[in-house]
Amino acid sequence: MTEIAVIGSGPAGLMAALRANELGHDVTVFEASPSIGGMSASFEINGMRVDYGSHRLHPSTPPHLLDKIKTLLGDDLQSRERNGRIRLYDRWVSFPLRTTNMIRHLPFKFSVNSGLDILQRPFIKPSDLTFADEVTNRLGKTVASEFYAPYAQKLWGIPADQLDGEQARRRVSASSPLAIIKRLIKSSTPTGRTFLYPKRGYGQIVEAIANTFIDNGGTIHTNSPVTEIITAAESCHVKAGGTDQEAEHVWSTAPLTKLAEIIHPAPDNSVLTAANALRVRGMVLAYLVLDQSQYTEYDAHYLPSLETNIARLSEPKNYREGDDPDNMTILCAEIPCWVGDEVWESSDGDIGEIVLSDLKKLGLPSARYIETHTKKLPSVYPVFELETMNEREALLTWGQTLGRVIPFGRQGFLVPDNLHHTLGMGWDLAESIGRQDQVDHTQWKTSVEDFKKNIVED
């Protein structure tokens, strides 16, 4: 039996903890906040369970992970058909995109210009330096400029030509116009639009993992931010929330920039300088409570235009068949921002007015508005800026040289991955130690290289 300390109780940390526990190890999880789950948690507002934004479990989840989740949740894991919309050219188009719907709703010039882009593609010398370059090369100038460029600026806070091309390779799944056509054909069938979602909200997944881990003898300390990790040849000493613990291994899902601050011996100044150079985009989540049973029939509205503050609007009630109140609904508006900017510092009431103003601009129905609740997330979207890519690579390289301390997960790898990706990271890390005393670093390195191929699914 090996003693393992896991930092963070998001999906990556919890899956690593549960799997390592099942393999016979003594695992303790340290969570800084009062509750588990991270951004994959759910919580209650006025009797309704809501998530930290719009989330869903994709059918592309690897079979071994999907089987695990199905075992944990049973019939509470529901198969649902997506019913979203995206705003393009001041018109609503089905999302995922469907061929007939696009033809019917998008202007003729969009189809013509996109077709010309495809014809010109073989004669254009490609560049993949920036996000704008990468998307233009793959999908053409029209799709890049009308959709991806403004959406990128809205999410990451800087123009698409100042973002590294790696951001597009991580975030944009379509590789060519042909790939879009294939996706259109697939999404035109119900099976191509399905997703999985728990009856009691997205957070039911991490809750089930945590409960099983505890039932198996694992320990989770909440309200326990790790303030120091002291490494030695044979063990590590973890200080967290007034608790001191010795562990043979520390697996950290904390932001890699934070890990550089709390680990001892301290890294070189060059590593600390690199960590300080990287920026992460925050988000304000606005939950508007409405005195009506349903706002629209759609689960999510995607809003790439810079004319609105909201990047995505979701209605949690429409994601599931659950025990939700009949006489009310809640909208969740996702507003990307920088920590400390005007949006971040706004009151709940002011945020609510921003959202209501955006709804009016979009021509959405008038809402029977009651009140607004907010959640402020300081670290959501890692920003792959051209000018700091060397620093990012330096920090990631340092993170793979820490011996008994292993960073992983979205924050540990500075990536924007989906739930099934982060669950896979936790599972693979636990499998790399198996029933032995030491992590097989060769096996783990292979997994890390595989993680670099992950592409976010919307």
Which residue stretches match the model-derived regions?
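Short loop/edge segments at beta-strand edges and connector loops
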Residues: 8, 79-81, 222-224, 230, ...
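Dinucleotide-binding Rossmann-like beta1-alpha1 core, especially the glycine-rich loop
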Residues: 46-123
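Glycine-rich FAD pyrophosphate-binding loop
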Residues: 21-44
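Active-site/ligand-binding neighborhood in enzyme catalytic cores
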Residues: 91, 107, 116-228, 232, ...
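Mid-domain catalytic core of redox enzymes
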Residues: 23, 225-349, 353-363, 367, ...
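N-terminal Rossmann-like FAD-binding beta1-loop-alpha1 element of flavoenzymes
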Residues: 2-29
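Conserved Rossmann-like nucleotide-cofactor binding loop
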Residues: 12, 35, 257
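C-terminal lid/capping helical subdomain adjacent to the catalytic/cofactor pocket in oxidative enzymes
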Residues: 386-458
